[in-house]
């Protein structure tokens, strides 16, 4: 590749105004340092009014989005970057939107034949107009207890709760609606929780070793995710080879069904009989010190910084067409 076709600075974009701002900043700092360790020129930027001017002032920039939640994962950022004709790492706007919205991604996965929990998406207006009492009874019959209640459009398990009885459901719904106007109520799957990172390199989609998650709390919530010592991680997960392969295949299938690109992380629960159930895929997985994706990279024997650099190079090559 000659000089005129080489990319310029890598703009690691982190922060934003979502509920996950602090996690995003931590992810951004880690990716920035990893890329600098590879000798790459990095510019760190928040999502603010000066971003477009910054991108226009750089020669052939490549954006590495580390925004979590909101415009970073719902396709909004990708649409702007397409408008500016700027290369970026990660999924397209449409694919990011599909995976971020659990009311869309879950049904798509189920329609494609992937094992998923029984689930219902309920807009806040519907919950309010029809009345909590009637809906609570119907949800109990359809989904059963215990159940999981979470916002349709949020990450890091914000607004997510486990509901063991009907009396707890209204408060859980209110908690989920605090993060968006649609809540997803889904069957609680009892089993081993694992995360499987997926990367695309040289046209090949690869699943990295599964990370087993053992939180101190009842569910893998925000505190368990980002507080050191609150969760035990087993890497690679303590799964038999056939079950580990089934999890890897499921993660890759979800990546492809949702049309994701470059990298993703599938959240999976393995039932006691060894059957993996797909919960959701994240198109912009966290990269903090306690995040699952970097742990999987390390377990695979890969260099995290080199992988980040390869993802940038792939994004630039794709941009050139």
Predicted feature descriptions by range:
Residues 1-14, 42, 57-58, 98-192:
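Active-site nucleotide/adenylate-binding loops and adjacent lid/helix of ATP-dependent enzymes
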Residues 75-82, 220-227, 283:
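Short, flexible, mixed-charge acidic loops at enzyme active sites
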Residues 79-88, 165-170, 299-300:
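A glycine- and small-aliphatic-rich helix-loop capping segment at beta-alpha/alpha-beta transitions
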Residues 7-13, 227-236, 292:
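A short small-residue
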Residues 2-8, 111, 240-321:
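ATP-dependent carboxylate activation and anion-phosphoryl transfer catalytic cores
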Residues 164-249, 270, 275-277:
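Phosphate-binding site of ATP-dependent enzymes
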């Amino acid at each position: 590749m000659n000089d005129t076709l080489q990319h310029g600075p890598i703009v690691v974009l982190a922060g934003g105004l979502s509920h996950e701002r602090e996690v995003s900043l931590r992810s951004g700092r880690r990716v920035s340092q990893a890329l600098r360790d590879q000798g790459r020129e990095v510019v760190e930027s928040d999502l603010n009014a000066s971003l477009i001017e910054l991108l226009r002032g750089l020669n052939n920039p490549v954006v590495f989005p580390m925004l979590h939640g909101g415009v970073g994962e719902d396709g909004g950022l990708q649409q702007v970057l397409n408008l500016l004709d700027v290369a970026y790492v990660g999924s397209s706007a449409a694919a990011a939107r599909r995976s971020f919205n659990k009311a869309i991604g879950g049904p798509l996965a189920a329609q494609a034949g992937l094992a998923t929990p029984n689930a219902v998406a309920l807009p806040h207006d519907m919950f309010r107009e029809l009345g909590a009492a009637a809906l609570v009874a119907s949800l109990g019959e359809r989904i059963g207890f215990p159940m999981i209640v979470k916002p349709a459009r949020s990450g890091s398990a914000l607004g997510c709760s486990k509901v063991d009885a009907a009396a707890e459901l209204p408060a859980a719904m209110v908690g989920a609606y605090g993060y968006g106007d649609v809540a997803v109520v889904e069957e609680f799957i009892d089993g081993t929780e694992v995360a499987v990172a997926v990367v695309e390199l040289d046209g090949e989609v690869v699943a990295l070793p599964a990370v087993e998650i053992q939180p101190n709390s009842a569910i893998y919530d925000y505190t368990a995710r980002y507080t050191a010592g609150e969760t035990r991680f087993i890497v690679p997960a303590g799964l038999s080879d056939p079950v580990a392969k089934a999890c890897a295949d499921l993660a890759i299938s979800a990546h492809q069904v949702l049309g994701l690109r470059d990298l993703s992380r599938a959240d999976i629960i393995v039932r006691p009989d060894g059957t993996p159930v797909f919960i959701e895929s994240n198109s912009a997985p966290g990269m903090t010190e306690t995040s699952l994706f970097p742990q999987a990279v390390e377990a695979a024997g890969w260099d995290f910084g080199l992988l980040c650099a390869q993802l940038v190079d792939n994004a630039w090559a794709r941009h050139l067409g």
